[in-house]
């Protein structure tokens, strides 16, 4: 037994050394570091689904006073980047940033990833209403937030510019800049920013989005 003790001690020291080297290379990621700073931004570890009772989907429709009511699931869609990431709410409180998350990493988000496209106050523009929260996408600073819908808010109006790939470029009417994301983000999510409109499809910068079907909970068929 004594013959094996030195060998076992040596193996333990090597394992500890290897673990230390691996931990030295790990890169901590902070989601709050990736978005413009704002006193209105509140970051949470994950979306907290509302406990309020919801209206049956068959009673949903939009009203003329600018307040949003529910609607049939077929009236909703996702805004999907070329890498499959979906534009989504992350923190449920109003005036928080929007992000782009792949479906596989945002299944717990539920319907906050779905949007309804509606005419804006001006005929040629549109606004996007969240299915779960009833809030609207709004251009703010260098990115997008979600806030109470109002037809009088120009920051909530967007122009859809078609491309020859079937995708669209989403242009903020108030800022004249376009919604941009990183299609090869090193994290499982991507920041969403506003930048000069050029229809970019570069490796680290993309402005093309697809109006895709909504993500819905699937039911297994026995």
Swiss-Prot record:
Residues 1-15 form the signal peptide. Residues 22-44 are annotated as: Disordered. Its main location: membrane. It is found in: Cell outer membrane. Pfam families: CDtoxinA. The keyword Membrane applies. One of its GO terms (molecular function) is toxin activity. It is a lipid-anchor. Keywords: Cell outer membrane, Lectin, Lipoprotein, Membrane, Palmitate, Signal, Toxin, Virulence. It comes from the Bacteria. A lipid is attached at residue 16 (S-diacylglycerol cysteine). Residues 122-211 form the Ricin B-type lectin domain. Disulfide bonds: none annotated. A lipid is attached at residue 16 (N-palmitoyl cysteine). GO terms for cellular component: cell outer membrane. PROSITE patterns: PROKAR_LIPOPROTEIN, RICIN_B_LECTIN. Residues 90-101 are annotated as: Mediates binding to target cells. InterPro entries: CDtoxinA (IPR015957), CDtoxinA/C (IPR003558), Ricin_B-like_lectins (IPR035992). The keyword Signal applies. Heterotrimer of 3 subunits, CdtA, CdtB and CdtC. May form higher oligomers. This is Cytolethal distending toxin subunit A. It comes from Aggregatibacter actinomycetemcomitans.
């Amino acid at each position: 037994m004594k013959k094996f003790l030195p060998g076992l001690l040596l193996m333990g020291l090597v394992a500890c050394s290897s673990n230390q080297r691996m931990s030295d290379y790990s890169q901590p990621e902070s989601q709050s570091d990736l978005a413009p700073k704002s006193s209105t931004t509140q970051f949470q570890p994950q979306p907290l689904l509302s406990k309020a009772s919801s209206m049956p989907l068959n009673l949903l429709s939009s009203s003329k006073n600018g307040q949003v009511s529910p609607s049939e699931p077929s009236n909703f869609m996702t805004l999907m980047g070329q890498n499959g990431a979906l534009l989504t709410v992350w923190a449920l409180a109003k005036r928080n940033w929007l992000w782009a998350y792949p479906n596989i990493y945002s299944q717990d988000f539920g319907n906050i990833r779905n949007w309804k496209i509606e005419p804006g106050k001006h005929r040629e523009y549109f606004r996007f209403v969240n299915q779960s929260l009833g809030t609207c996408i709004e251009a703010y600073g260098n990115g997008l937030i979600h806030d109470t819908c109002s037809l009088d808010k120009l920051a909530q109006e967007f122009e859809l510019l078609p491309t020859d790939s079937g995708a669209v470029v989403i242009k903020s009417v108030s800022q004249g800049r376009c919604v941009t994301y990183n299609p090869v983000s090193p994290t499982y999510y991507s920041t969403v920013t506003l930048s000069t409109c050029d229809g970019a499809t570069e490796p680290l910068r993309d402005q093309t989005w697809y109006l895709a079907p909504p993500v819905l909970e699937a039911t297994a068929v026995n």
